[in-house]
Amino acid sequence: MPAIISDQFRILNAETFVQSFTGIGTTANYYTFLGHPNPANVTIPNYGDADWPQEPKDSFEQEYGYHDSMMFMKRITSEDIARVVPRYDWQSGSTYDMYKHNYDNVNTAPQLSSSTLYEAKYVVINSEYKVYLCINNGQDPENPRGKKSVVEPNFVSTIPQAASVIAQDGYIWKYLYTISPADVIKFATEKYIPLPKKWGDANTETVKNASQTGKIETVSITNRGINYTLKEGSTVRLPILGDGTGGEVTITIANNEVSTATVTAGG
């Protein structure tokens, strides 16, 4: 029978690992160490030498060798560890994925052909180390993969919005948090950025408290339809059908088809 280790299980494992650094008594301590290089030994297969590093093995014999070669070590504390996510610096002219709950191996995220949400290119960091989530990338029938982003997001409002009032790229961003200078120096790399140590702390409390589970923030048009007989430029308010209540979207008709669709009540 097929089996899967879900992303949520991986996240739980990462969280459990991070929490283990707080220690239980004096038994849960982690260390990083540096050992002296082992001399070449051509009589042992895969032993390695200066030009061919030894292959790591998961065995007690290998562990004994690590201990024998240790020169010094440093204890790793809870202040030395952070959860991270892939780093995507915002760049003008780049296209980003939008948040969707249904990415899978059939319906992949278009930018990287990712089969899961967490592998998609939908979280960006701007030039001031503010982190945003893309909830709309301008996707429409003419641009099914999304549009190029041309205006850098730089707001800290808790309300999802365009990067500016003049932005015409169709992007809607949600501000998440700002990485502190200390965390940038300690944890940020070319490939990864750190997450907040705890959602809802002093740095993220406002964002967390403003979030609403199950609220619809944006919609996209997949088919504009044809032969609508409403007056040119007419707007129509329609209920959103789903497993929630109170959702409403306003559509605009132009050239006998749906021109725009905007959420007027998120439910």
How would you describe each model-predicted region?
Residues 1-211:
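Tryptophan-rich substrate-binding surfaces of secreted polymer-degrading and adhesive proteins
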Residues 166-267:
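Conserved, function-critical positions that sit in or immediately flank catalytic
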